[in-house]
Amino acid sequence: MKLVIVEVGSELVAELWDAPVEAAAGILCYPEGRAALAAARRGGRLSSSAYGRACEEFESLQSELLLVGIDQPLAREAGELAERHGLRGYDAVHLASALALGAGTTLVSWDEDLRRAAAQSGCPVAPPG
């Protein structure tokens, strides 16, 4: 969302997006992103016209992502990660997705619990903290 709505971390996310590596995300980023945009609209952070533009930009960005789907093994791994690290279900799916992509994958998150779990699982995190 930090590419669509300017907030803390938007500059770093833009730099990472423009880096010469493929951007990937778990498939849950789509409903989470749409929910965040709708919440921003309801909360008055986006006008009706800004909301429409943000949705269009979000859809465009989605088309550029490598999306990691959820299958039974990934769901089970997410369950294990949730239990081991005390994560919420969707955060565990995001971490399992990053781990499934393998070495060299950096998980980008501002959620401290998810960042801690990623680091403990051997997954690099951004922003550095």
Regions found by a protein language model. Give the residues of each.
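Short, well-structured N-terminal submotif of metal-dependent ribonuclease cores
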Residues: 1-29, 40-52
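Residues that scaffold the ATP/ADP-binding catalytic core of kinase and kinase-like folds
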Residues: 2-4, 36, 117
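Acidic catalytic patch
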Residues: 27, 53-84, 92-93
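Acidic, PIN/NYN-like endoribonuclease modules and their adjacent C-terminal/linker elements
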Residues: 95-129
